[in-house]
């Protein structure tokens, strides 16, 4: 064992008294009685001296700052005044030397120079004043931030309160600095270097201040017993008791300390918000979905405890969503009651404690799904042997997400009044787990592909059903008989449009895709999803309708009633789809999306968004399909009519004498014309029973126009025959033609204007014909309206007058 070393004598440690100044010796003699007293009180004296030196240094720094500020202000003012007075003296002296005629121009020029110089001086003065004020505030901030951190951390609530007071002063100083910088940014854009310099110094202080405030806040939460247990073991009547909230158990100094810590976090967030707004003055504004930082600090420890359960339930997402909903609901009222007054004290505008809590919980869940769940589903979807299982899991998860968002929306809306459902502002992205797809466009695209393929597959199964395209003729007949004439055209349901059953299936699947798109909280991803799914699915439906119509054998050689009924199926379905698309497009949700799409043209050509509504291009294509199909049916009718009575309606037809069916006193309709009109009447009856009223109205009106052209052209195509019986025959056949449309309108002659005017010409007396010839020779074409003729061309009227 080594012998103990003796400490050195004091003579080797203390300085030689002979070398010390007199003031130092006097100070030591005044504070220490003897050597033993020196050993006992030396450390205390050293601490006091260091403290006094620190205070003196602080005072010296403030004195230097004040002295610099006053000196610069005085020097700047005096120099500016001296220079201005000297310039004014020189200008007045030079003004006396100028001739009288040039005094005015010189005076104006010099006054302009004086104004510019004064503005420059004023601008410099503002710069110096602003710089000195910022220097003073930044120095004060640095003192508040760095001075308390250099000391020993307090372990009591009093030490924490002192530290919070210093931090609060620092945040207040930062807000004052930010207010000045905001004014400089708006009105003095050339002072960029000053702003950057101040930002750099403030950021250094903030990099120390923010972690310290957050660390103290987390430590205080941990001391309160946060987070609590996620469930209790006490069960009564089959229900688990609600989870106790430690925030509501705080009293006295603890409650006040937490309140101050909460306000510090809110102050930091407010400062950060103002700073971001200042930096984005000249940039494109983006929607910030940051929640309340203080609420996020409550959720983070809860999330770490919940993740254990989440990992166990990765393949049973309904349990995950149920747990999050339960915890959110159990703590929401307590959080709202305790934190909302603090938010009001922090003067956070439009901030709800309940919504901030719900948003933080939802964002926590979204983060877990983003990191742990969806990557696995994407991998399963890419693997061929697991693709079907991946799609099934994907659908199940998305359904759970949509249901969860609706439950959360309903929960938040219990005591708040939000805008209409589906609006882009009704359910913020922060309170929607579906917002995950807004952040991940590639996942949104994958989801759209899965939904579209599934909808198309199910639609192909629907059209294979034997009754898919069946029209209930008996039901529509009874409906036609019971409805009034005006009510026939007030259509709303599938039965009103006489559409087949498959039309409802098409619409239901389309709306399901749209409804999934509307569950997205952001409007642009919503548009992208609906365009990628519902819109493309509509084009698939149009193709199915087109193929179904092409299956009908529309031929004028063997046109049957069954063929016409089969053709009515896709026509009615198209009209029903058109009505629903127009109804959806008038909804405010689609009006908003169309306006947003028109402004940014999301994945659409410019001309596509100019149709007047969200489904404008689809409606345009659907109307073209309906028009083409109706024209095809009309063309078949006209061809069949021409085949049956092609030798009639000529004014020189030789077969009229043989085809006349006589009665006791009057002429009757020709056999060929009667057969053609009977065919036409039967076909119209079939269409009237099986086609929707709107398309049937368009069909018979256009058919009447075609027959009107056909008959009038036939009348003027041959050589004139001056036999009264021929005229009577044409009149009888034409009148029979008009009666075919009698069941569908009151005045069928209004839809055959050319035939009606031919009959008028044939019924003219010789004197009236002579007047018409004379008027044509004198006035030309302008006189026809005086004789009630406006649809026949002047050339045809002249031909008639020359021939008869």
From Swiss-Prot:
Tissue expr: Highly expressed in dry seeds. Expressed at low levels in roots, rosette and cauline leaves, stems and flowers.
InterPro entries reported for this sequence: RINT1_Tip20 (IPR007528)
Pfam family, one: RINT1_TIP1
GO cellular component assignments: COPI-coated Golgi to ER transport vesicle; COPII-coated ER to Golgi transport vesicle; Dsl1/NZR complex; endoplasmic reticulum; endoplasmic reticulum membrane
Induction and repression of expression: By salt and osmotic stresses.
Subcellular location(s) per record: Endoplasmic reticulum membrane
Superkingdom of the organism of origin: Eukaryota
Deleted gene: phenotype: No visible phenotype under normal growth conditions.
GO biological process assignments: endoplasmic reticulum to Golgi vesicle-mediated transport; protein transport; retrograde vesicle-mediated transport, Golgi to endoplasmic reticulum
Lipid bilayer topology: Peripheral membrane protein
Disulfide bonds: none
Keyword field: Endoplasmic reticulum, ER-Golgi transport, Membrane, Protein transport, Transport
Domain annotation RINT1/TIP20: ranges: 205-804
Role played: May function in the anterograde transport of protein from the endoplasmic reticulum (ER) to the Golgi complex and in the retrograde transport from the Golgi complex to the ER.
Family: Belongs to the RINT1 family.
Protein name: RINT1-like protein MAG2L
Organism this protein belongs to: Arabidopsis thaliana (Mouse-ear cress)
The encoding gene: MAG2L
């Amino acid at each position: 064992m080594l012998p103990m070393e003796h400490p050195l004598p004091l003579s080797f440690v203390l300085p030689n008294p002979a070398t010390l100044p007199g003031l130092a010796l006097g100070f030591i003699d005044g504070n220490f009685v003897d050597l033993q007293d020196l050993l006992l009180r030396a450390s205390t004296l050293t601490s006091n001296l260091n403290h006094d030196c620190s205070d003196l240094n602080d005072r010296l720094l403030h004195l230097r700052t004040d002295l610099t500020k006053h000196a610069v202000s005085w020097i700047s003012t005096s120099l500016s005044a001296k220079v201005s007075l000297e310039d004014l003296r020189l200008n007045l002296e030079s003004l006396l030397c100028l001739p009288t005629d040039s005094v005015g121009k010189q005076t104006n020029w010099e006054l302009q120079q004086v104004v510019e110089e004064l503005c420059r001086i004023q601008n410099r003065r503002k710069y110096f004043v602003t710089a000195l004020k910022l220097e003073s505030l930044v120095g004060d901030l640095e003192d508040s931030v760095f001075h308390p951190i250099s000391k020993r951390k307090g372990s009591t609530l009093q030490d924490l309160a002192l530290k919070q007071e210093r931090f609060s002063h620092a945040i207040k100083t930062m807000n004052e600095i930010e207010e000045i910088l905001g004014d400089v940014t708006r009105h003095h854009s050339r002072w960029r270097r000053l702003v950057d310099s101040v930002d750099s110094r403030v950021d250094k202080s903030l990099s120390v201040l923010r972690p310290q405030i957050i660390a103290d806040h987390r430590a205080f939460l941990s001391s309160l017993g946060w987070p609590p247990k996620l469930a209790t073991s006490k069960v009564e009547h089959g229900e688990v008791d609600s989870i106790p909230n430690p925030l509501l158990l705080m009293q006295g100094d603890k409650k006040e300390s937490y309140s101050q810590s909460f306000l510090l976090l809110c102050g930091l967030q407010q400062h950060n918000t103002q700073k971001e707004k200042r930096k984005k003055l000249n940039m494109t504004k983006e929607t910030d979905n940051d929640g309340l930082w203080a609420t996020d600090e409550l959720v983070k420890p809860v999330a770490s405890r919940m993740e254990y359960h989440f990992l166990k339930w990765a393949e049973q997402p309904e349990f995950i969503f149920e747990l999050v909903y339960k915890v959110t609901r159990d703590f929401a009222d307590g959080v709202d009651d305790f934190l909302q007054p603090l938010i009001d004290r922090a003067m956070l505008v439009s901030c709800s404690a309940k919504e901030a809590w719900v948003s933080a919980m939802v964002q926590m869940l979204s983060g877990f799904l983003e990191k742990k769940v969806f990557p696995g589903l994407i991998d399963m979807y890419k693997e061929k042997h697991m693709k079907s299982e991946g799609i099934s899991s994907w659908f199940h998860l998305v359904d759970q997400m949509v249901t969860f968002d609706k439950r959360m929306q309903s929960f938040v809306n219990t005591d708040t009044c939000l805008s209409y459902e589906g609006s882009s502002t009704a359910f913020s992205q922060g309170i929607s787990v579906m917002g995950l797809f807004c952040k991940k466009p590639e996942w949104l695209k994958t989801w759209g592909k899965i939904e579209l393929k599934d909808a198309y597959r199910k639609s192909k199964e629907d059209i294979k059903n034997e009754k898919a395209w069946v029209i209930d003729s008996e039901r529509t007949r009874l409906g036609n008989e019971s409805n009034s004439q005006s009510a026939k055209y007030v259509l709303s349901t599938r039965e009103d449009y006489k559409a087949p059953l498959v039309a409802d299936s098409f619409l239901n699947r389309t709306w399901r895709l749209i409804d999934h798109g509307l569950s997205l909280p952001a409007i642009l991803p919503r548009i992208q999803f609906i365009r990628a799914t519902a819109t493309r699915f509509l084009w698939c439906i149009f193709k199915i309708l087109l193929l179904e119509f092409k299956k009908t054998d529309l031929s004028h050689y063997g046109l049957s009633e069954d063929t016409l009924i089969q053709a009515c199926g896709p026509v009615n379905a198209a009209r029903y789809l058109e009505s629903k698309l127009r109804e959806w497009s008038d909804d405010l949700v689609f009006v908003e999306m169309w306006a947003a799409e028109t402004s940014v043209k999301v994945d659409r050509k410019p001309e596509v968004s100019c149709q007047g509504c969200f489904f404008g291009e689809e409606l345009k294509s659907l109307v073209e399909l309906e028009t083409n199909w109706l024209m095809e049916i009309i063309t078949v009718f006209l061809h069949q009519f021409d085949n049956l009575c092609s030798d009639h309606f000529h004014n020189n037809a030789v077969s009229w004498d043989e085809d006349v069916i006589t009665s006791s006193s009057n002429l009757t309709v020709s056999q060929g014309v009667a057969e053609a009109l009977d065919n036409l009447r039967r076909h119209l009856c079939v269409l009237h029973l099986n086609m929707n009223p709107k398309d049937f109205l368009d069909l018979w009106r256009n058919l009447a126009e075609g027959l009107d052209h056909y008959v009038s052209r036939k009348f003027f195509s041959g050589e004139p025959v001056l036999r009264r019986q021929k005229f009577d025959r044409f009149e009888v056949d034409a009148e029979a033609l008009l009666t075919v449309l009698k069941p569908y309108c009151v005045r069928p002659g209004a839809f055959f204007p050319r035939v009606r005017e031919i009959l008028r010409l044939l019924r003219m007396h010789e004197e009236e014909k002579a007047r018409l010839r004379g008027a044509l020779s004198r006035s030309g074409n302008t006189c026809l309206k005086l004789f009630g003729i406006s649809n026949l061309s002047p050339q045809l009227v002249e031909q008639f007058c020359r021939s008869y």
